[in-house]
A protein has these predicted regions:
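N-terminal secretory signal peptides
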Residues: 1-22, 47
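Predominantly soluble domains enriched in secretory-pathway, periplasmic, or organellar proteins
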Residues: 17-18, 27-36, 48-298
Length: 298
């Protein structure tokens, strides 16, 4: 780099507002202040007062024999590849639902029936469960389905809540690592929205690893919730992280990082800011209906 180029770099104005590094520094100071306040506040509790408060809180979470929890919570099992159902407020584990794993107790992943459900991904013996979400009608849980994604092998599975078992599974094509899954809320869960996290070359056949190439990108994915088939995919720059849909049925939005299309952490953190990508669902549907799309050989 010559002196002229160095001068140009030095003269680039800082973006307005609080920078990422400034925010982290401010957060550290704020955290120290809050910690101090908590310590001061904690000093007013005697041991007896604290014990009484803890006992009262415990009594509100106790669910006795023959009693039912008020709510059921659905947790992802992470690298276990399963979904776990827990009672709330008791926090007792009630059931484990095998999804992306092999389960000897039930035969999941071993029986012909379960292999038919798993389809072309039945040979995988592992999964990385993320983001379980319940289907909705008019913005409220309808108790019909639960959907969950597998980051390890780019899959999305559906669990029927009337039987608490996985009944459909889809391998998302043209992508690497499905991460970030949400559902259309209004008027009902027509689509399952799933981010593909990593930028990859297309076709991803090993002929190139150039992420700066125009044919290197990631995809925002919409899955037909009833058929469990791909509805559409949208080409996006940068790695997609998390996603969500609004309460009007019009928009979905995804957070993005690595707008630099870098390979390492330092490169991915180079830009001060990345972006949020907003998708207009009706316009996407209209474009597909008008034939304004391409087909990828995934």
């Amino acid at each position: 780099m010559n002196d002229t180029e160095s001068k140009k770099v030095a003269e680039v104005p800082e973006p307005t507002g609080l920078s990422r590094r400034g925010f982290l520094g401010t957060s550290a100071v704020t955290g120290a202040v809050l910690a101090g306040a908590t310590a001061i506040g904690g000093a007013v509790f005697t041991r007896e007062t604290w014990a009484a408060a803890a006992k009262d809180a415990q009594s509100k979470t106790h669910v006795g024999p023959g009693e039912l929890d008020e709510y059921y919570g659905f947790w992802s099992g992470g690298h276990q590849g399963e979904v776990r159902i827990m009672g709330i407020p008791s926090m007792r584990e009630l059931l484990r639902i095998p999804v992306f794993n092999v389960d000897s107790a039930t035969g999941w992943g071993l029986t012909n029936e379960s292999k038919r459900i798993m389809g072309d991904s039945a040979h995988f013996q592992n999964g990385d469960c993320h983001h379980p979400h319940l289907s909705m009608t008019d913005g409220k849980y309808d108790g019909k389905y639960l959907f969950i994604n597998d980051k390890a092998n780019s899959r999305v599975a559906r669990i029927r809540l009337d039987i608490m078992k996985c009944d459909k599974m889809l391998t998302v094509p043209n992508v690497q690592a499905v991460h970030g899954l949400r559902l259309q809320k209004i008027p009902h869960t027509k689509y399952v929205f799933a981010n593909a996290e990593f930028v990859i070359p297309h076709p991803n056949d090993g002929s190139t690893f150039d992420l700066q190439d125009k044919n290197s990108y990631t995809l925002f994915n919409a899955i037909d919730a009833e058929k469990m088939e791909m509805a559409f995919q949208v080409i996006v720059d940068g790695n997609l992280d998390n996603t969500d849909a609004d309460y009007t049925g019009k928009y979905a939005a995804s957070t993005c990082y690595n707008s630099e299309k870098a390979y390492d952490l330092g490169g991915m953190m180079r830009n001060e800011r990345d972006w949020v990508v907003v998708f207009n669902i009706q316009r996407i549907e209209a474009a597909i209906k008008a034939g304004k799309f391409i087909t990828l050989d995934g």
